Amino acid sequence: MSKNSKAYREAAEKVDRTKLYTPLEAAKLAKETSSKKQDATVEVAIRLGVDPRKADQMVRGTVNLPHGTGKTARVAVFAVGEKAEQAQAAGADIVGSDDLIEKIQGGFLDFDAAIATPDQMAKVGRIARVLGPRGLMPNPKTGTVTPDVAKAVQDIKGGKINFRVDKQANLHFIIGKASFDETKLAENYGAALDEVLRAKPSSSKGRYLKKVTVSTTTGPGIPVDPSVTRNFTEA
């Protein structure tokens, strides 16, 4: 839905810009303002009160959404031998080592998440400049550098998402599809926000959640009350 289209303007008119919606209200309105031509992804954008330039104010983490993302993630795994077999059995879409690295160096990036066993990280480091900017670099803090590759694959396939603050102190994550019931969207939102709150740096001063917006990939942004940090399914 183009922002210049009549349908988008009509959808945007349904959003009261003077109001801060509850998570449940925002989820319901996101569904109503989404394009009916496709099952759009529902996204959350948060402006944080941190300074990402400071190492001790980096916010990142993972969360298993209780109702999944509505999307089956494509997972690449860097592993060899028995670990490679375990990854394949768990449903990994592509598994390899030097061959996979060479493929990525050649431009292959048809996956949504990457996992590596610890012994592969020295090799994976060769493509850090390719994977890092795209949020695909395996990292122990997000559980994607692990000897238990099978569990890591299953977690991601089951709805595990990663979040990381960007250079502008913004953080983005998805909470499902427009076809989801609004209660499920609100519960996914709550699970993710709980982890964002847990990840608050001790050195962060002042208001941590400055601005929260919910939208679909085809609809307008909906302002959410950042003070609502519990009872997410209440209107």
Swiss-Prot record:
Segment forming the signal sequence: none
Keywords from the named record: Repressor, Ribonucleoprotein, Ribosomal protein, RNA-binding, rRNA-binding, Translation regulation, tRNA-binding
CDD domains hit by this protein: Ribosomal_L1
Record-linked InterPro entries: Ribosom_uL1_bac-type, Ribosomal_uL1, Ribosomal_uL1-like, Ribosomal_uL1/biogenesis, Ribosomal_uL1_3-a/b-sand, Ribosomal_uL1_CS
GO (cellular component) term, any one: large ribosomal subunit
Sample GO molecular function, one term: structural constituent of ribosome
GO biological process, one term: regulation of translation
Keyword set includes Transmembrane: no
Record text on subunit structure and interactions: Part of the 50S ribosomal subunit.
Functional note: Binds directly to 23S rRNA. The L1 stalk is quite mobile in the ribosome, and is involved in E site tRNA release.
Family: Belongs to the universal ribosomal protein uL1 family.
Protein's recorded name: Large ribosomal subunit protein uL1
Organism: Mycolicibacterium smegmatis (strain ATCC 700084 / mc(2)155) (Mycobacterium smegmatis)
